[in-house]
């Protein structure tokens, strides 16, 4: 017994024999108090703009929203019942849509190129929505995954490889904790979540598999199904994610880990869908929103007025970043794997705008004022290390003069330029504060961009 202990002693002492100058990595306990102390990896705040992709079996009926199955079978909303009666044979089940979910035209490289053109710095892809269909070959989702059925391809892997090989975007995954109609979840739910058969046999094994196999740098949890975080063992999983996982140094997480966690616990806050407070928050947050005003998934019945214009999208990006948030802008591909032209157009338009104005978005900080209280539709960001303030204005004044009520300029020190024009602009000081900028006389074709412009102000207070 003593000999065995002596042989084991060197192994026990190994953690103490670190080289000088090497510090032990921070370790987090499986409690919110400990987990919430983890610093958010810097890349996320610097990124500012990401793309959300909702794609699944729901993309085949492509009617109403990605909640099609629930609205049809559970709530039995008349428009969904009528849609099925008018378009599919009696007895057609939701599971039958998977045969039609071919992803025939899905080209991960093409998707990656479009994402790169958008100017986004990260992408979050739905690995599994509330319908339970996994977009990779999960052995916990037998005959209800993209490798066994439908596309018969590992969609997650194909997109991950394309994004990492062809773009500079960080790759992230969305995962729904619960599933609407999974019998084990329904059984646990009927016990008021005293039983934990579903998370133990389904949710947690899939989460560990996703992280180990695809190494996402964003893990976007959703869908607690009315269950508390301890039912999902969220703190235990996150402790492993932060301490031991292959992405422990770079991964960011959101706040949807069980009832009571949203807008309170997690890496960054989402608070609600399309959350956009319009003022500065003390915690990093994200505005996850949709180009289609009414759905995250593709809708075949959508009209042109249902889509946000590029002007509206630029405004959402600017006001979100000015208030310290990131914008996660959603698109919904079709069942055959194509990105609808209107989504591609919006993505490329955002990229065009960011090529000119990205300096005022990426790696910026909030300023002492988020927006101008005198002139509407003017939002501020800053780079204090360079003594720069950016004033992003969404309406070009007819007079050619833009009054900014917040900055205080100094004669001989303050300089003003228009991003994409790069000629010093004349400005005058106003009392008691503010400056008036003489904008350049430009024709439509000389404009550096079309949907919002940025003034770079140096040495203002």
UniProtKB/Swiss-Prot annotation:
EC number: 3.2.1.51
Glycosylated position list: 165, 233, 371
Pfam families: Alpha_L_fucos, Fucosidase_C
Organism of derivation: Mus musculus
Site (May be important for catalysis): 288
Function: Alpha-L-fucosidase is responsible for hydrolyzing the alpha-1,6-linked fucose joined to the reducing-end N-acetylglucosamine of the carbohydrate moieties of glycoproteins.
The protein's enzyme class: hydrolase
One GO cellular component term: extracellular space
GO BP: any one term: fucose metabolic process
Reaction equations catalysed: an alpha-L-fucoside + H2O = L-fucose + an alcohol
Signal sequence interval, chain numbering: 1-25
Quaternary structure, from the entry: Homotetramer.
Keywords: Glycoprotein, Glycosidase, Hydrolase, Phosphoprotein, Secreted, Signal
Intrachain disulfide bonds: none
Positions carrying Phosphoserine: 295
One GO MF term: alpha-L-fucosidase activity
Name of the molecule in the record: Plasma alpha-L-fucosidase
Localization (cell): Secreted
The UniProt record lists the keyword Ligase: no
Family the entry assigns: Belongs to the glycosyl hydrolase 29 family.
């Amino acid at each position: 017994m003593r000999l065995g202990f002596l042989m084991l002693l060197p192994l026990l002492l190994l953690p103490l024999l670190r080289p000088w100058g090497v510090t032990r990595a921070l370790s987090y306990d499986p409690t919110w108090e400990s987990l919430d102390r983890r610093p958010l990896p810097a890349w996320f705040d610097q990124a500012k703009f990401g793309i959300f992709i909702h794609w699944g079996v729901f993309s085949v009926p492509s009617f109403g929203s990605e909640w099609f199955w629930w609205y049809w079978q559970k709530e039995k909303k008349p428009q969904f019942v009528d849609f099925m009666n008018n378009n599919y044979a009696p007895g057609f089940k939701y599971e039958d849509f998977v045969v039609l979910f071919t992803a025939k035209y899905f080209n991960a490289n093409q998707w990656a190129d479009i994402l790169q053109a958008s100017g986004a710095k990260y992408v979050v892809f739905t690995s599994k929505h509330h319908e339970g269909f996994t977009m990779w070959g999960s052995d916990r989702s037998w005959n209800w995954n993209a490798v066994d059925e439908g596309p018969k391809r590992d969609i997650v892997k194909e997109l991950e490889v394309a994004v990492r090989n062809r773009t500079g975007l960080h790759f992230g995954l969305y995962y729904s904790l619960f599933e609407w109609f999974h019998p084990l979840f329904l059984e646990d739910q009927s016990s008021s979540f005293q039983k934990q058969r579903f998370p133990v046999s389904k949710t947690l094994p899939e989460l560990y598999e996703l992280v180990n196999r695809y190494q996402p740098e964003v893990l976007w949890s959703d869908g607690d199904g009315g269950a508390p975080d301890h039912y999902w063992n969220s703190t235990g999983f996150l402790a492993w994610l932060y301490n031991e996982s292959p992405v422990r140094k770079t991964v960011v997480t959101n706040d949807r880990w069980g009832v009571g966690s949203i807008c309170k616990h997690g890496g960054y806050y989402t608070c609600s869908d399309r959350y956009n407070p319009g003022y500065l928050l003390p915690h990093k947050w994200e505005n996850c929103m949709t180009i289609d005003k009414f759905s995250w998934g593709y809708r075949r019945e959508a009209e042109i007025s249902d889509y946000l214009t590029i002007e509206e999208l630029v405004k959402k990006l600017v006001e979100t970043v000015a208030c310290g948030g990131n914008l996660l802008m959603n698109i919904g591909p079709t069942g055959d794997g194509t990105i609808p032209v209107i989504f591609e157009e919006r993505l490329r338009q955002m990229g065009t705008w960011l090529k000119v104005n990205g300096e005022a978005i990426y790696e910026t900080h909030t300023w002492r004022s988020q927006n101008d209280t005198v002139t509407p539709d003017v939002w501020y960001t800053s780079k204090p290390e360079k003594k720069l303030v950016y004033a992003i204005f969404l309406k070009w004044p007819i007079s050619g003069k833009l009054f900014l009520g917040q900055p205080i300029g100094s004669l001989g020190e303050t300089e003003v330029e228009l991003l994409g024009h790069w000629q010093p602009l004349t400005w005058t000081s106003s009392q008691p504060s503010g400056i008036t900028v003489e904008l350049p006389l430009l024709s439509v074709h000389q404009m550096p961009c079309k949907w919002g412009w940025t003034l770079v102000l140096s040495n203002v207070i």
